[in-house]
């Protein structure tokens, strides 16, 4: 009940934009703090068969019946490929400082490799997009890989299950740095590697959709106890080699920065029992530390080494040194918090899988009460204090890095029976961002080096396995006509960010 009363109070408070602008606004943050909003190629661009683009694993996966909740796909998405110039006007209308987007690997290298040819039309599209972003006074924050492996590499050698992916990714990154790095000063190698590896190779709920038959009969045959870790290992090596290339070949002249974007929930002990407190650590290690520990310390968390054993790949001494320190900043995506309850004994018949290797039952409910107000997406519950806790944890454990909150947002149902005029009144989203910005500000005051905050997402988009069933955007998109409408939250941000 406490969180409900708080949410109602905050909604009432932030509904008065003028009052918020006078009390809490962009000037409540450091002068160089960056506010932005985000997107991703497959979720936005559409035009999958235009401009020389080759297919990605998401083109394949989304067209398999039953993989996407509403049977949809990203063939058109929000048609950003054709509408980006007018769409970017919304970003400036909201007084944002930056625009985050990803480059589609298969739009640059349709066959995934340099030898397969560089697509000049793809280069031209992203050059134009970058120039349009900059011409509006916005900073481009560019992600090199956001889940969309070229299908050609999946067919050729199972992509991230093979060490061959390292060279091909570095070659692709090299093209991006060379063609766009004179204007792009903030690069992310990968977005949410944990989601990509756990979903794509553990549960099979993300492309390429692989898992063990004992996890699901609906997956492509895989190995949920091994493949997530193999894919993650090769991804980390690809990331580190790309960072080394950028630092050795481009950084001195282009004067940019490069990092990687992680994702994690925050976790709260289910009870005061010591076992549940230990479960919090294991939860963080398996979700966050899996990809953070190697780039900070040069190896996986000790808890993972202990529980996963020989299924967890080992770095050579040279690889450990390569991976360690391979970032200038950390992107951090946060959406929700869970309770962590220890599983004291692993059932003897339970077969290995990433999802159960941590010996933790993660839940948003305790005694039937949710940890916070539920979003439309079933796994998300609003718990803004968790963002502050995650930021403080990152500062303490991971050597006090520069951090950009690269994604933070909430969604509502895509309900076609609600008139658009009503659907635009997203007070819940305003409350969500207000709360999370307040806790971000508090973390900064406590010494966390948070450099920016990006909303997820810019406009209602294709949300992977959920399709178009939910709406995360600040801008409403009519799925029938693709016409754009500004939600109330977009006006709130315009006022909050007014200079």
From Swiss-Prot:
The keyword Cytoplasm is annotated on this UniProt entry: no
Enzymatic reactions: Hydrolysis of terminal, non-reducing beta-D-glucosyl residues with release of beta-D-glucose
EC number of this enzyme: 3.2.1.21
PROSITE patterns hit by this protein: GLYCOSYL_HYDROL_F1_2
Keywords from the named record: Disulfide bond, Glycoprotein, Glycosidase, Hydrolase, Signal
InterPro entries per record: Glyco_hydro_1, Glyco_hydro_1_N_CS, Glycoside_hydrolase_SF
Active site, UniProt feature: 192 (proton donor), 407 (nucleophile)
Keyword tRNA-binding: no
Signal sequence coordinates: 1-19
Residues listed as glycosylation sites in the UniProt record: 111, 361, 408, 414-415
Disulfide bonds: 211-219
Chain residues that bind a beta-D-glucoside: 43, 146, 191-192, 335, 407, 456, 463-464, 472
Pfam hit, one: Glyco_hydro_1
Any single biological process term in GO: carbohydrate metabolic process
Recorded GO MF terms: beta-D-fucosidase activity; beta-galactosidase activity; beta-glucosidase activity
Protein family (similarity comment): Belongs to the glycosyl hydrolase 1 family.
Name of the protein: Beta-glucosidase 27
Organism per entry: Oryza sativa subsp. japonica (Rice)
Lineage: Eukaryota, Viridiplantae, Streptophyta, Embryophyta, Tracheophyta
